[in-house]
Amino acid sequence: MASKRILKELKDLQKDPPTSCSAGPVAEDMFHWQATIMGPSDSPYSGGVFLVTIHFPPDYPFKPPKVAFRTKVFHPNVNSNGSICLDILKEQWSPALTISKVLLSICSLLTDPNPDDPLVPEIAHMYKTDRAKYESTARSWTQKYAMG
């Protein structure tokens, strides 16, 4: 069941990739993908290329994939391990969602962080109280880690 669904998503992704994202299996393992997300141009992540790993559970799509940033990113909803705080990867997951939609949601999270449900409270606090400092820090991390 899972592998059939994952194959279908891979075909759909190759046919119609989401804007500024790409994804596919690592080697021969269909349950382990790597994705790239281009930093949105209207965000401090602009110009960066962010690597993301995707691990599908055996009962996908009834359980969400595990998605994490491999590239360091300064963001209130992404911690130093790359874990992403995004409702659709947790309690809001639905089997109707696809990796394409997940990648687009991560892109929009880069543009519009959710400081009210932070994974890193200090960054969320900076985002709310000193937006200029947040944006310049996010920009310098992007240049340092995502433009190699």
From Swiss-Prot:
Membrane-spanning parts: none
Limits of the UBC core domain: 1-147
BP terms from Gene Ontology: protein ubiquitination
Reactions mediated catalytically: S-ubiquitinyl-[E1 ubiquitin-activating enzyme]-L-cysteine + [E2 ubiquitin-conjugating enzyme]-L-cysteine = [E1 ubiquitin-activating enzyme]-L-cysteine + S-ubiquitinyl-[E2 ubiquitin-conjugating enzyme]-L-cysteine
Keywords from the UniProt entry: ATP-binding, Nucleotide-binding, Transferase, Ubl conjugation pathway
Active site residues according to the UniProt entry: 85
Tissue specificity annotation: Expressed in seeds, pistils, siliques, hypocotyls and leaves.
Gene Ontology molecular-function annotations: ATP binding; ubiquitin conjugating enzyme activity
Pathway in which this enzyme or protein is active: Protein modification; protein ubiquitination
Enzyme Commission number, as recorded: 2.3.2.23
SS bond list: none
Family note: Belongs to the ubiquitin-conjugating enzyme family.
Assembly mode: Interacts with SINAT5.
Role: Accepts the ubiquitin from the E1 complex and catalyzes its covalent attachment to other proteins.
PANTHER family attached to this UniProt entry: UBIQUITIN-CONJUGATING ENZYME E2 (PTHR24068)
Listed name of the protein: Ubiquitin-conjugating enzyme E2 28
Phylogenetic lineage: Eukaryota, Viridiplantae, Streptophyta, Embryophyta, Tracheophyta
Gene assigned in the entry: UBC28
